[in-house]
């Protein structure tokens, strides 16, 4: 008998059912910002779904330009970006897998000059000092997270 008898059993999450309990955790591949990154990510993730991964968690995608990991970093804050993200989603779904977008705001670790954070304290690994968010900017950023999540569901 297997030491993990439930590993390959379906898992009902209420809103969806996974074909098994094999999950690929989030990792940044470096393809997210590549000119043909969507196609490359689609092939990368689809191969994992094809070989049995039930749920794939993407690398971090910012909910606003202020939260990208670097200039030109992955962001989902506008419906015009959905076709790019759907390339990846469709590839995984076509192989029988599910995919979840990791929403990631990098805060003071964002390596670009327009970074924001709760306070203007520079990260020890960053040459840029963040702009300290005001109360209204924090509320706007919360809205950015909600919009990103809604767009991710559409993708």
Name each model feature, range by range.
Residues 1-155:
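Flavin-dependent oxidoreductase catalytic cores
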């Amino acid at each position: 008998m297997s030491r993990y008898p439930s590993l390959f059993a379906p898992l009902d999450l209420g809103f969806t059912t996974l074909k098994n309990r094999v999950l690929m955790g989030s990792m940044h591949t470096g393809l997210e910002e590549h000119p043909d990154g969507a196609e490359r990510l689609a092939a990368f993730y689809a191969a994992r779904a094809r070989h049995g991964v039930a749920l794939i968690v993407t690398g971090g995608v910012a909910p606003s330009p202020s939260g990208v990991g670097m200039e030109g970093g992955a962001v989902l804050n506008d419906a015009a970006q959905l076709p790019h993200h759907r390339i990846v989603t469709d590839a995984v779904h076509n192989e029988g897998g599910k995919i979840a977008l990791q929403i990631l705001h990098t805060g003071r670790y964002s390596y670009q000059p327009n970074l924001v954070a709760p306070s203007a304290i520079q990260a020890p690994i960053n040459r840029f000092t963040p702009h300290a968010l005001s109360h209204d900017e924090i509320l706007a950023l919360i809205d950015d997270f909600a919009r990103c999540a809604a767009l991710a569901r559409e993708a």
